[in-house]
């Protein structure tokens, strides 16, 4: 599975700026920007950001106003502020932290970013698990379990994701899984016939990949009008007016 996935990734990965001449700083910036934001939206912002703030030290010495201004348009401004705080910490590093646990203690860094940074930039065998990975994994293994929500699915599937990590190329493996989810294993109309791991995919071979993952649909909240209260106060107001 890993060999098929990585061979495909080596030949078909998208040409993204944070993959060219990669560094710890570029990985951190890209992962912060890509939280809840599409790659196509991030691309121009990433290039401008790197030109303006080429390293942790430059970012750390910038004012918060400059940082937020450079982020303007990407939304979720807490990401920019946390990134600024992280840069101030990083500018004093003699060596970066090497474990997921240590990274999760930094501003704005959750399980996903911690695993992405440690695997991509530091070559540690730590698997990422987000919505893309949930979709890919539940389809490959045809996992019938219904999850309460996406966050629950990610937490439950993290051990499975970890068991599949390629220890020789953990960063490339994580990026390949993300690439697969973004470009082939779509939420709707997945491109199963061109999938590099189709031979390993139970739901794909059975022809019902779109049935996975199984996430409970959110129930619409029902709002009730308290007719009695409305009528009572309406009549009371009328009496007062008379």
Identify the residue ranges that each predicted region occupies.
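A generic signature of intrinsically disordered, low-complexity regions enriched in glycine/proline
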Residues: 134-136, 183, 224, 230, ...
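Catalytic cores of DNA base-excision repair glycosylases
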Residues: 3-4, 8-191, 197-206
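Short cysteine/histidine-rich zinc-coordinating motifs and their immediately flanking basic loops
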Residues: 204-214
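Conserved Nudix-box catalytic region and its N-terminal flanking loop in Nudix hydrolases
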Residues: 234-242
């Amino acid at each position: 599975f890993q060999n098929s996935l990585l061979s495909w990734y080596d030949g078909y990965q998208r040409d993204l700026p944070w993959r060219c001449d990669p560094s710890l700083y570029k990985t951190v910036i890209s992962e912060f920007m890509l939280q809840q934001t599409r790659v196509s939206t991030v691309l121009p912002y990433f290039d401008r950001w790197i030109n303006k703030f080429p390293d942790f030290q430059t970012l750390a010495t910038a004012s918060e106003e400059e940082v937020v201004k450079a982020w303007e348009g990407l939304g979720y401004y807490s990401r920019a502020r946390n990134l600024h705080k992280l840069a101030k910490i990083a500018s004093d590093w003699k060596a970066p932290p090497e474990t997921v646990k240590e990274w999760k203690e930094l501003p704005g860094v959750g399980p996903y970013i911690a695993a992405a940074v440690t695997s991509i930039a530091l070559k540690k065998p730590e698997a990422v698990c987000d919505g893309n990975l949930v979709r890919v994994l539940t389809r490959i293994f045809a996992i019938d379990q219904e999850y309460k929500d996406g966050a629950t699915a990610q937490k439950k599937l993290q051990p499975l994701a970890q068991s599949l990590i390629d220890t020789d190329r953990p960063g490339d493996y994580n990026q390949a899984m993300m690439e697969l989810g973004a470009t082939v294993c779509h939420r709707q109309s997945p491109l199963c016939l061109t999938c590099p791991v189709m031979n390993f995919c139970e739901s794909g071979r059975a022809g019902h990949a779109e049935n996975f993952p199984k996430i409970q649909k959110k129930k619409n909240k029902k709002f009730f009008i308290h007719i009695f209260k409305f009528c009572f106060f309406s009549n009371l107001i009328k009496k007062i007016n008379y």
